Amino acid sequence: MAMSPSLFYPVEQELCSLEKNLKAVAGTRHPILYAAAKHLFDAGGKRVRPALVFLVAKATSEKQDINTGQKRLAEITEIIHTASLVHDDIIDECTTRRGVKTVHNLFNTKIAVLAGDFLFAQSSWYLANIENLAVVKAISKVITDFAEGEIRQGLVHFDPSISIDAYIEKSFYKTASLIAASCRGAAMLNGSNHQINNDLYLYGKHMGLAFQIMDDVLDITGSTKSLGKPAGADLINGNLTSPLLFSLTQEASLNDLIDREFCNSTDIASTLFLIKRSGGITKAKDLAKEQVQAALSCLQFLPQSTPVSSLKELTHFIITRLS
């Protein structure tokens, strides 16, 4: 299901400007890095993260304005996210993302590593110029969290003993941390009080977890065409996600497939079938819905406004997409 344009209507103009600015970020004196970075941003994406920054910025402003610091924060958030995808694709040996070739597949691994590093460096430079130490600290911690999440994931490849709690914690580091910190950062740049800042951090955290669980479900249920990558790609790389973890108690034969690391040509298809048969997808959806409800509860103290309504609609969209 596509992201509805109406969800981001209150910040449509800001998102258009963001697209232009992201292309400018790729403007470097090194042609090959320029080509790699431009390829990434041209691939598009839902731009959920910067949209959330803009919506939170308007939701916490009496005049529903977005200041310069918040515009920079939205750009930084998307740059960091994009940089992390480049490195993730190298580690997971993905050949496509969003239906186009990954950077290391189009160029080579060396260029992809440098492109990811370049984007992280650019984000750090823009972040330093926001001139709000609390926001700088919060977003800087996210980059550390990315590394923490990747290490945790790497240590449990093809490990069926991983708990749901450990899965959630890893998902926080890899996905939710950035969304949580950027939502809080947008509110902080409006001078919001501690309670509002904390509520929006938790909103972003629960939204991020719901999105990650949703992506993990879609990795099982989606098609190569809709995903822009092969179904079961996470499993192929040894990343055992919630639908499979929930299925292990019902389908003992999954352990044999995991033990041989899905090496046979039919193993992934068999695994997807067993996950669907066992009810693992339903349980994963229920877990995502719990996160969605937790996110909604974090918005209850914000004054009603069009941006707040969009935040709620975006939250409900996750439930709709998982239905």
From Swiss-Prot:
UniProt keyword terms in alphabetical order: Chloroplast, Isoprene biosynthesis, Magnesium, Metal-binding, Photosynthesis, Plastid, Transferase
Enzyme category, top tier: transferase
Ranges that cross the membrane: none
Positions annotated to bind an all-trans-polyprenyl diphosphate: R97, K174, T175, Q212
GO cellular component: chloroplast
Gene Ontology BP term (one): quinone biosynthetic process
Subcellular location: Plastid, Chloroplast
UniProt remark on cofactor binding: Binds 2 Mg(2+) ions per subunit.
GO molecular function: metal ion binding; prenyltransferase activity
Positions contributing to Mg(2+) 2 binding: D88, D92
Gene3D superfamilies: Farnesyl Diphosphate Synthase
EC code: 2.5.1.-
Annotated family: Belongs to the FPP/GGPP synthase family.
NCBIfam families in alphabetical order: prenyl_cyano
Protein name as it appears in the record: Prenyl transferase
Organism: Pyropia yezoensis (Susabi-nori)
Annotated gene: preA
